[in-house]
């Protein structure tokens, strides 16, 4: 074998070695990636089960409070404790329970009371007053209320000041009205006339529950939600009076709606219209769980509703997100 042939043979050996190294590196990288994906999947599954376990504990806690106080729900009960944190083997669970009846149910906007004959349903009047209490001009508040009513009703006929498909299809890109109950509060951003600033102001006061009922629990409304309490009544109840009423509330709240309506600040207003939409007892709660495992965060939001003597899940939303390393 001459020098030229030996050189070619050596070159081929080197090429084969290089190819083997590339393949080995690729296989190692692929194996590491598959291992990481498997580990992440297992972590996510474990986090989900942690959240479901915490959900079961939340339901049991609500059940115990309901048995202890079947006719009242208030902020001195165990469920209302904030900042719950549980340590598990490889992470932490953060849990919060809030009253789903301490907000305005947007899906109740078209509901009417048993004896109500007004042209505009009382919940729609409440929503209009809430918008005004949050700084909206009266005309804009009326337009947004009508737009929401059109969005959740099942017809294509616009109300006075309302908006149906033709209004939204004229936008770019165009879209159609829901013509069904809201699935999430974020749908408000799609309403004609809604902007980001007003939407952010509204968020603490509203919810989109799985049914169309409205029963605002005056025992669990925080003083900083006085705008909603004032909106439940005609304009005679001011924001200042509503806030003072909530601040003066006993730790265990009012024993009945009648006891609440007997407060001096409410004697100057028409309480009969608001009465059907008030409560001192809640049967629906929102439990929010955050499971922290390394850099991963697993979020779950469960709507729990009283079903007989226990609480069951009627809606559950969950997701996973990652936090970048510092």
UniProtKB/Swiss-Prot annotation:
UniProt PTM: Cleaved by prepilin peptidase.
Keywords for this protein: Cell inner membrane, Cell membrane, Membrane, Protein transport, Transmembrane, Transmembrane helix, Transport
Cited SUPFAM superfamilies: GspK insert domain-like, Pili subunits
Keyword ATP-binding: no
Prosegment location in residue numbers: 1-7
Annotated localization: Cell inner membrane
InterPro entries reported in the protein's UniProt record: GspK, GspK_central_sf, Pilin-like, T2SSK_SAM-like_1st, T2SSK_SAM-like_2nd
One BP annotation, GO: protein secretion
Origin superkingdom: Bacteria
An annotated GO cellular component: plasma membrane
Keyword Cell membrane set for record: yes
Transmembrane segments: 8-28
Residue ranges, Periplasmic side: 29-326
One Pfam family linked to the record: T2SSK_1st
Main function: Component of the type II secretion system required for the energy-dependent secretion of extracellular factors such as proteases and toxins from the periplasm. Plays a role in pseudopilus assembly and seems to control its length. Interacts with the pseudopilus tip complex that is critical for the recognition and binding of secretion substrates.
Subunit structure, as described in the record: Type II secretion is composed of four main components: the outer membrane complex, the inner membrane complex, the cytoplasmic secretion ATPase and the periplasm-spanning pseudopilus. Interacts with core component PulG.
Name this protein carries in UniProt: Type II secretion system protein K
